[in-house]
Amino acid sequence: MSKKIKVGIVGATGYTGVELLRLLAAHPDVEVAAVTSRSEAGTAVADYFPSLRGVYGLAFQTPDEAGLEQCDIVFFATPNGIAMKDAPRLIEQGVRVIDLSADFRIWDIPTWEHWYGMPHAAPGLVSQAVYGLSELNREAVAQARLVANPGCYPTCVSLPLVPLLRQCRLKPGMPLIADCKSGVSGAGRKGNVGSLLCEVGDNFKAYGIAGHRHLPEIRQTIAGLQDGIAEGFVFTPHLAPMIRGMHATVYLHLSDGICPETILRDYYRDSLFVDILPAGSTPETRSVRGANLCRISIQQAAQSDVWVVLSVIDNLVKGAAGQAVQNMNIMFGLKETHGLGAIPLLP
């Protein structure tokens, strides 16, 4: 395209922010015009992120000084509670917004306020937001002014379930269990004891068993596709001793006489970022590292009526920044692969 899309990134000093900068640097149709950070205002992006030396000549600015209203689209890579305060003004000025936080993911306001522990600052805007699971809501994303980018766990769990739920192939009243593992980068860049090398290295643990914020998000997707399933959904996340990557093992009960692998292959036949592996395969997190990919396999457990789904993504790419860029491409009628052609890193 002749005129490049002007992009702004709010909160660009975190892991999703730098991942957006990395991906957009390879995008042929965009110009990153503004990057904001209140704490690092005045600091050159290349000084703060040495990996971007020679790539960007920008410096961080405060949101008030960055001229975000002159952008065509703004990404919010901010903590929960920021976008719902700042996005409405930009949308009123004709700027399209993709929010990578959870501010607009949950449609039911009391549910959101319960899980996120604060009053919602823009409840009237929630109904206008499109949930940006690209492979589920592509047509709605294309028309959206505001996209709520999904969380990493919801992306990894939902992508293998969507084709089966759309055909109502899960057995109602039976448990649906997602056993998930995430790299430490999912906790963000702010320092905390739980993310220290001495805490996570050579260690493995579950967390959020009493309730994780992504639970209502996943249940919302399930409930919107098939009745009688979301109530039996159980989700247990784990922290794995790796920097990036996410693995979901999902146990489910399916209708008799179907071939779920065929259902998944048919649904994702034209999807560029979902790879359905042959039955018996075991996708690895390293097979998607650095790429906007989800690799999935499904097979029946031995001597059981339980089916086992394996799903892997890079939590920072398909689980965050990559899916956000994919949604931007859809919104502006671009090829979905633009900026997202990176091959997974190995080793």
Swiss-Prot record:
It catalyses: N-acetyl-L-glutamate 5-semialdehyde + phosphate + NADP(+) = N-acetyl-L-glutamyl 5-phosphate + NADPH + H(+). GO terms for cellular component: cytoplasm. GO terms for biological process: L-arginine biosynthetic process. The keyword Zinc-finger does not apply. The keyword Lipid metabolism does not apply. It is an enzyme of class 1 (oxidoreductase). It comes from the Bacteria. InterPro entries: AGPR_AS, AGPR_type-1, NAD(P)-bd_dom_sf, NAGSA_dehydrogenase, Semialdehyde_DH_NAD-bd. Catalyzes the NADPH-dependent reduction of N-acetyl-5-glutamyl phosphate to yield N-acetyl-L-glutamate 5-semialdehyde. Belongs to the NAGSA dehydrogenase family. Type 1 subfamily. This is N-acetyl-gamma-glutamyl-phosphate reductase. It comes from Neisseria meningitidis serogroup C / serotype 2a (strain ATCC 700532 / DSM 15464 / FAM18). The lineage of its organism: Bacteria, Pseudomonadati, Pseudomonadota, Betaproteobacteria, Neisseriales. The gene is argC.
